[in-house]
Amino acid sequence: HIKAETSDQDMIFMGNDGGSEITALTLDMSAAGNATFNGSIFSGGNVVVPNGNGIDFSATGDGSGMTSELLDDYEEGDWTPDIRQSGTAVSDAAYNTSFTAGQYTKIGRLVQMTCSIRLTDKGTVTASNGFQIGGLPFTSTNNVKARSAVSLYNHLGAGIDMTGNTNGTLMGLLSHNADEITFRVEDFSGTTGEAVLYEDVGDTLYLQLAFSFITG
């Protein structure tokens, strides 16, 4: 091993580049000292960051509303959406598993998600219960500014019956402090709308969704 015997003195790795003396690496020998490299760091393996730490971008310029400059998380994976009425999963709903799946990527607090969900039987219906899609691996942050619109495709003839609803557009919303998507039909003027009920859902529902949101 390499050991510095002199108290409170840095260890400096120096060299000669074309006749010029350069400092390649400085090791601060204090208890919480840093290693400072003169140039880029190249790794043949993974860079492992302890929990609670990350990449600090405080050297960059800031927006007026900046609250953090630490990139402390990255994750990607799969998730499985489920059908809910009034917040409860429909236990006897049957899914076409070949078309019921999702993927996500989480960078910091931002989560980007896609999924498709397809039924073969929607199961037991309770009148006037709202319709939701759940199963999200993360909950949105508890801040009304973080509500997220959902981009969706309702497959014709295998989706949601809107004949009894306000004439307009089917919309999805992930509210704040939520782990499920709710659905509404808004009229074209944007002045009225109503929630989609589970009784409006077809037995062969087939939806595809894409959305992003901020976690807590």
Predicted regions and their residues:
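Beta-strand-rich receptor-binding modules of extracellular spikes/adhesins
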Residues: H1-V49, Q103, L110
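Short acidic, glycine-rich loop/turn motifs
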Residues: A4, G15-D17, A59, I83-A89, ...
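Surface-exposed ligand/attachment interfaces on beta-rich extracellular proteins
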Residues: G19-S20, A59-L70, D78-K106, S116-N142, ...
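Residue-level detector of buried hydrophobic side-chain packing
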Residues: L27, V111-C115, L136, F211
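Glycine-rich, low-complexity segments
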Residues: A32-D92, T141-K145, Q208-G216
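Short, exposed beta-strand/loop patches in secreted or surface proteins that constitute
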Residues: V47-V48, A101-T105, T169-H176
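Extracellular attachment/recognition segments
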Residues: F138-E186
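Domain-scale recognition of soluble eukaryotic interaction modules
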Residues: H176-G216
